[in-house]
Amino acid sequence: DNQTEIILKHGGTIDKYMGDCIMAFWGAPLPDENHIENATKAAIDMRIALEELNETLREEGLDEINTGAGINSGPCVVGNFGSTTRFDYSVLGDAVNLAARLESSCKNYDADLIISEHSLVDGYEYEFLDEVTVKGKSEPVKIYTIRK
């Protein structure tokens, strides 16, 4: 609930829950001129909430929880997808695929948040991680994390 509340507080839309993953997006169904800023703020607040939870878990002698987040922005298609008998409100597109790949790369870079070069906003201290070429694309993308 805590992580979901943070996403909603920052204007995000929950797309779906997949195991231990929450997929969310900003800018739909209502436009959001500050969608990248709001997604970044949500990711930072989620990081802080998780650090607090992990401190409690450590005190109780339990294992910590580690998460990863990928932030990317770009053109997407948003709407109801599926059939007439079962459909979901969701988002599709290359920008979504890159965000998912960034999230899945967090372990490789020992990072809890990876942001594409297209999604950097003012007010944070970024650390360059790498330049990656995404499957199916020829142009590399620079990726960053936000220092803790």
Predicted regions located by residue number:
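Alpha-helical scaffold within the catalytic cores of cyclic-nucleotide enzymes
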Residues: 1-12, 28-69, 94-107, 117, ...
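Active-site loop/short helix in cyclic nucleotide turnover domains
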Residues: 7, 26-30, 75-83
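A short pre-motif secondary-structure segment
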Residues: 14-16
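Short beta-strand->loop micro-motif that forms the acidic, two-metal-ion catalytic signature
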Residues: 18-32
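A structural signal for short, well-ordered beta-strand segments
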Residues: 22, 67-73, 143
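Allosteric regulatory "coupling" segments in signal-transduction proteins
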Residues: 36, 87-92, 129-132
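Short, surface-exposed loop/helix-turn segments at secondary-structure junctions
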Residues: 58-59, 81-93
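Cytosolic regulatory/linker segments at or just downstream of nucleotide-handling modules
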Residues: 76-78, 99, 105-148
